[in-house]
Amino acid sequence: MAAAAATAATKGNGGGSGRVGAGDSSGARKKKGPGPVATAYLVIYNVVMTAGWLVIAVGLVRAYLAKGSYHSLYYSIERPLKFFQTGALLEILHCAIGIVPSSVVLTSFQVMSRVFLIWAVTHSVKEVQSEDSVLLFVIAWTITEIIRYSFYTFSLLNHLPYIIKWARYTLFIVLYPMGVTGELLTIYAALPFVRQAGLYSISLPNKYNFSFDYHAFLILIMISYIPLFPQLYFHMIHQRRKVLSHTEEHKKFE
């Protein structure tokens, strides 16, 4: 579940649309890119997703200017947030049919972790929707996704501005911890309401002889951040050094 905030930075190594140009300098990958029809589709997909997250960003700014407060801004962008984040499920299909050379399993984990947070936590536990922690991860996701989908679009067009590449491999240093903090605080805020309502929990006895405690499940998800966060974060730091140093070396030779 820690991948929910790391998606933007880790997906470039496998998991979304336009992964061919996601910072990998492997000549083999570039030669084995998608065909013209698939490339055109991926460009359109990434342009639409970039525009969608820009709509969310503009919605946040407009709501803030209208209210004069950052509290409860979630309600102003709830629908587009759900729509475009759920739209990322197509990225799993892209990997499954082979137009993007990424792991279906890894991509599924990354995408579903965010979809889970949006629908199974924020949507299902309405009491947390006014929490500032929701705004924290929404802002982190919004900036991240605008950069990520822009990165994929320009990469597919073989015209990637350095500023976008730099932003993709630099801003996560702040955005990843910011997103993770927002996610954890949101899940934590949901716990008492989940327990009180028995949300998504299954008690014994029942004909299937099966029980499930959603409250305990959310706690396990929070605990999973402890080993996953540092591993993913330092992996991304390593990727940043590798990708940006390679770019600088390439510029010197030019």
From Swiss-Prot:
The biological processes this protein is annotated with in GO are: fatty acid elongation; sphingolipid biosynthetic process; very long-chain fatty acid biosynthetic process
The record's region (Disordered) falls at 1-34
Note whether Transmembrane helix occurs among the keywords: yes
Cytoplasmic side stretches: 2-41, 98-107, 147-169, 236-254
GO terms for cellular component? endoplasmic reticulum; endoplasmic reticulum membrane
Q: Which residues cross the membrane?
A: 42-60, 80-97, 108-125, 131-146, 170-187, 218-235
Domain of life from the UniProt record: Eukaryota
Record's protein name: Very-long-chain (3R)-3-hydroxyacyl-CoA dehydratase 2
| Upper taxonomic lineage | Eukaryota, Metazoa, Chordata, Craniata, Vertebrata
Which gene is transcribed and translated to give this protein? Answer: Hacd2
